[in-house]
Amino acid sequence: YYMLTPDGCYYNFSGVGNTLNCNHPVVRQFILDCLRYWVVEYRVDGFRFDLASSLGRGEDGGPLSRPPLLESLAYDPILGHVKLIAEAWDAGGLYQVGSFPDWNRWAEWNGRYRDDLRRFLKGDGGMAQAAVQRIIGSPDLYQPDKRPNASVNFITCHDGFTLHDLYAYNQKHNEANGWNNTDGSDANYSWNCGTEGFTEDPDILTLREKMCRNAFAVLLCSRGAAMFLAGDEFGNSQYGNNNTYCQDNEISWLDWSDLERNAGLFDFVSRMIAFR
């Protein structure tokens, strides 16, 4: 059931210590049976696979050109019509954005969109051409025969900063996680607009909201499927923590009172969605 090294240790392409041997016939059938059950019995109409590139590795850990599991998912009579979304990389360094084996069925989280647009929006030099590529559907990544929604465009997700925090913090602040602020990504491409974290300065607060509006405007006018993090539409904050997996408290909860405080942002996002 697991990928093993020649000396019997676990391969770790998942970041959690072991990796399921997805393309072994027995394991592949087990996965297909589980997904079919969710579709037939619970009417689930789509699946998003975390670290999906690990699904395309062989028994020795190497990437396969035609992974049997991914091909089976694409052509299965039950699963062949549900939405399939891949986080097209894994914890072992395999990065397949634009090249994930998809049989014209899978959509991909476009990590290049996130990184390039973050850098462009905060004014990094030399990013205009990359931003154009992302906005028009990333044709440098996805060939003309790809569906327009093959790219799932996003600037924020459950991993990393919220949109509010992207423009309120230059550095992550994960001290509450207990790892001396060593966990979580350092490649945030964020900008605090002049002050780190909380402020009552009206000029900085106005600038931060403008940056959030810029991000939503670009995202919702880009070719491809648009995705944003719940709470971003009303300025939810995680207080600079960009890795809240272990926080079941005010750090990770949605503060619905922000909906009233940031009604202007919420109205703008609603209108942008209607415009799209």
Regions found by a protein language model. Name each.
Residues 12-29, 52-64, 103-106, 194-208, ...:
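The substrate-binding groove and active-site-proximal loops of carbohydrate-active enzymes
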Residues 229-234, 238:
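Short acidic/histidine-rich active-site segments
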Residues 260-276:
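Catalytic cores of secreted or luminal carbohydrate-active enzymes
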